[in-house]
Design a protein with these regions (language model features):
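Core catalytic lobe of class I
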Residues: 1-208
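S-adenosyl-L-methionine
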Residues: 1-8, 212-235
Length: 235
């Protein structure tokens, strides 16, 4: 991974980061297509995520709020890699789903953690009671949102409402939300709904198409590719 994919942000412009990187669990979708995610196992996963945290620091303003969805089984790695990049870990938030995810664990998973913290720098207190906080005083660590049923497009799609609930506390309209693992495009749609701007990166062309198609279906705006409009809903 190089800086080439972050050129659109220039030097330190992101106001908020919300991202859903590979979890390192070799996840396979439950649909007939058995969708997978690149770099979702072993050393590849660790190197990609660790480098992404460094790029997040490069592309963000000092003290930028960062949200990182991850697997509970990989929590130690995510926090250590986050702090190794110079970021400050604040706390873990929890997304509680409306249904369990069947797997091989003794207790079936019904939640996912989201790491919350800040990029290096920033003056004074960061978060509630200080800089980069636009929510009220009643925000809790638990967020209850239904798991998206349309997983035929992406195996780990996140609900738009979940992302909106978090970034609305950390970014103002017109601000830039950065997602280096674009995935299904939920971050882009959430930012659009809140009148924010978004910059996404996605390695897999298949999911790049999903991002553009979901955005077009949600907004009616036809994306542009190489300077020309491209209708992704007809593919």
């Amino acid at each position: 991974m190089t800086l080439s994919w972050t050129k659109r942000l220039g030097g330190g412009q992101a106001d908020c980061v919300w991202t859903d990187p590979p979890y390192g669990v070799s996840y396979e979708g439950k649909t007939k297509d058995k969708l997978t995610i690149q770099n979702d196992s072993g050393v590849d996963f660790q190197e990609v995520v660790a480098d992404a945290f460094l790029q997040i620091v490069r592309c963000s303003k000092p003290g930028t709020p960062v949200y990182v969805a991850h697997a509970d089984t990989a929590r130690t790695f995510f926090q250590e890699a986050f702090e190794a990049a110079g970021c400050m870990f604040r706390e873990n938030l929890v997304w509680v789903k409306n249904t369990i995810v069947l797997g091989h664990s003794d207790y079936q998973w019904k939640h996912e953690p989201i790491l919350y913290g800040f990029t290096p720098g920033g003056a004074g207190r960061l978060g509630r009671g200080g800089a980069h906080w636009y929510g009220d005083n009643k925000q809790a660590t638990v967020f209850e949102f239904d798991k998206p049923s349309r997983n035929a497009e992406h195996p780990t799609m996140k609900p738009v409402g979940l992302i909106e609930a978090m970034i609305s506390n950390s970014c103002q309209p017109g601000g830039i939300v950065f997602d280096p693992f674009g995935g299904s495009g939920s971050t882009l749609i959430a930012a659009y709904d809140l009148k924010m701007r978004a910059v996404l990166c996605e390695l897999d062309p298949r999911y790049g198409d999903v991002i553009c198609r979901r955005f077009q279906e949600h907004t009616g705006i036809i994306p542009r590719c190489d300077g020309k409009e491209h209708d992704f809903t007809t593919e």
